Amino acid sequence: MPRQAASRLVVGEGEGPPGASGPAATMLRSLLLHSLRLCAQTASCLVLFPRFLGTAFMLWLLDFLCIRKHFLRRRHPDHPEPEVELNSEGEEMPPDDPPICVSDDNRLCTLASLKAVWHGQKLDFFKQAHEGGPAPNSEVVRPDGFQSQRILDYAQGTRPLVLNFGSCTUPPFMARMSAFQRLVTKYQRDVDFLIIYIEEAHPSDGWVTTDSPYVIPQHRSLEDRVSAARVLQQGAPGCALVLDTMANSSSSAYGAYFERLYVIQSGTIMYQGGRGPDGYQVSELRTWLERYDEQLHGTRPRRL
């Protein structure tokens, strides 16, 4: 009897509970998945790091006022001197892309600025949107009622849909809003326009700049984002305005931080503007709209 009991004990220990390999296999798969993600993030950091270092070095140089004044006054060779435009009363209109102004008391190379630059470059690197490719149908939120929608819900048939990403604390975005408003007024018969309010470029508790026209902290909730968007809506053109989600899904999909312009037509990205502040050029959008209008109506439009 003792031998039989001992043998039964040994056999019982060797069998183990049924399905014991299930949790182990799940844990192994999870470990492999996390390892792959870590490798992908490490590889992306290695690719982005030289670009980030170059930007950080440029910001450090621009903290020397003599360099800042010389560099910011110099016009980029790809952006020729703009044409002088007159309104109906013969008065000179402001340019589409006024030069970026940075006050002397603003430091550009700080921990907060480097965090913001890294965040923007990372979003641009991982964005889903590319010119000529399909437009990401990311989630947006209506400011009235917090109703969830999709970006392509605002596209109507084959009409182009212009996306304008930005926030109140972004000086170039706000400085060029009047030029964007002129385009909305001129082309809204054939083109749809949508402003997407994203996370603040220069929140009062982040990368602070005295050049920002408003003092707004980072959004902690959709209510905060709605309050900021209403400030923009007071002086915004007569086009639809929606909010990015608190997960920043649209800004991530389009690499839109700090600000950016896109044109979507029939679900395809027809124009992808550069990432702000340097690449945010309303004049480029105007050129695209003029060409589209010429193709549509056969005559070159007169500038406002």
UniProtKB/Swiss-Prot annotation:
Q: What does the record say about tissue specificity? A: Neonatal skin, placenta, skeletal muscle and cerebral cortex.
Membrane-topology annotation of the record = Single-pass type II membrane protein
**What catalytic activity is recorded?**
3,3',5'-triiodo-L-thyronine + iodide + A + H(+) = L-thyroxine + AH2; 3,3'-diiodo-L-thyronine + iodide + A + H(+) = 3,3',5-triiodo-L-thyronine + AH2; 3-iodo-L-thyronine + iodide + A + H(+) = 3,5-diiodo-L-thyronine + AH2; L-thyronine + iodide + A + H(+) = 3-iodo-L-thyronine + AH2
Q: Where is the active site?
A: U170
State the EC number(s).
1.21.99.3
Q: What segment(s) does the record annotate as region Disordered? A: 1-22
Give the domain of life. Eukaryota
Q: What is the effect of changing U170L?
A: Loss of enzyme activity
Q: Which UniProt keywords apply?
A: Cell membrane, Endosome, Membrane, Oxidoreductase, Selenocysteine, Signal-anchor, Thyroid hormones biosynthesis, Transmembrane, Transmembrane helix
Q: What GO terms in the biological process aspect are recorded for it?
A: apoptotic process; brown fat cell proliferation; hormone biosynthetic process; positive regulation of multicellular organism growth; response to hypoxia; retinal cone cell apoptotic process; retinal cone cell development; thyroid hormone catabolic process
Q: Name one GO cellular component term.
A: plasma membrane
Q: Where in the cell is it found?
A: Cell membrane; Endosome membrane
What InterPro entries does its record include?
Iodothyronine_deiodinase, Iodothyronine_deiodinase_AS, Iodothyronine_deiodinase_I/III, Thioredoxin-like_sf
- List the GO molecular function terms: thyroxine 5'-deiodinase activity; thyroxine 5-deiodinase activity
The transmembrane segments are 43-62
Cytoplasmic-side segments: 1-42
Q: Which family does it belong to?
A: Belongs to the iodothyronine deiodinase family.
Task: Give the record's subunit note.
Answer: Monomer. Homodimer. May undergo minor heretodimerization with DIO1 and DIO2.
Task: Tell me the function of this protein.
Answer: Plays a crucial role in the metabolism of thyroid hormones (TH) and has specific roles in TH activation and inactivation by deiodination. Catalyzes the deiodination of L-thyroxine (T4) to 3,3',5'-triiodothyronine (rT3), 3,5-diiodothyronine (3,5-T2) to 3-monoiodothyronine (3-T1), rT3 to 3',5'-diiodothyronine (3',5'-T2) and 3,3'-diiodothyronine (3,3'-T2) to 3'-monoiodothyronine (3'-T1) via inner-ring deiodination (IRD). Catalyzes the deiodination of 3,5,3'-triiodothyronine (T3) to 3,3'-diiodothyronine (3,3'-T2) via IRD.
- Protein name as catalogued: Thyroxine 5-deiodinase
Protein species of origin: Rattus norvegicus
Q: Which gene encodes it?
A: Dio3
